[in-house]
Amino acid sequence: MKLFLVRHGETDANRVLGHSVEGPMHNEPVIFKSGDDTNIPLNIVGRGQAEHAGGELPGVIDELYASPLLRVKETAEIIAGTKNIDPKNIQFRAELIEYHQGSLEGLTASEQKERMGVDSRGSGLLCNYNYTPWGGDNWETIYSRLSSFFDELKKHGHDKNIVCITSGGVIRMAYKIFLKDKSPSITKHIMIKNGSIHEFVID
């Protein structure tokens, strides 16, 4: 099975920050956009990135999955269009939804520190797989649900090209799953830009 993980195209939130936001596992401002209140669409650059990604993917896509978040859904629909895939054949899966920080959602690292009274990055708190911010996810849950999803794909995905459109934090977690290493440093230098494609060959 060849598994292609694609990060959604750029949104205005990504552009305003001036860099890709990948989450608490590397040295960037901690701002997540995954909840309903921050479920924002692609901008014109992001739509172009999705179109480009579609052109870079294999000519034959056997199965196309996506997170139901708006920016991911739009990316998936654009990619489907480049491959003449009926958008109705996109399979939306909750397992591919980005990590949600709950009460910390949308805050920079300094704003989180002010709210929590502790440096969420410097303390390693948000890298703790069992820490759950109020109303949010924890990394152990993400790891578990994503592992189960990949196991499901492996059962029927032999000799298939499978594409999953998702978010940066999920792709970073996928690397940890396939490398069998949960340490923050394992993905520190992996770039996961908007519209980027990450290919895994799975026996």
Task: Map each language-model feature to its residues.
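Short glycine/proline- and acidic residue-enriched helix-loop micro-motifs
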Residues: 32-38, 120-141
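A polyampholytic, Gly/Pro-enriched intrinsically disordered region
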Residues: 108-121
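Domain-level recognition of soluble alpha/beta enzyme cores
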Residues: 30, 140, 181-203
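Short glycine-rich phosphate-binding loop at a beta-alpha junction
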Residues: 61-68, 91, 161-165
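Active-site-proximal alpha-helix that buttresses catalytic centers in soluble enzyme cores
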Residues: 2-85, 115
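Generic beta-sheet signal
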Residues: 3, 158-169
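A short, structured active-site edge motif that brings together acidic residues
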Residues: 68, 86-105
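Glycine-rich phosphate-binding loop signature in dinucleotide/nucleotide-binding domains
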Residues: 57-60, 153-160
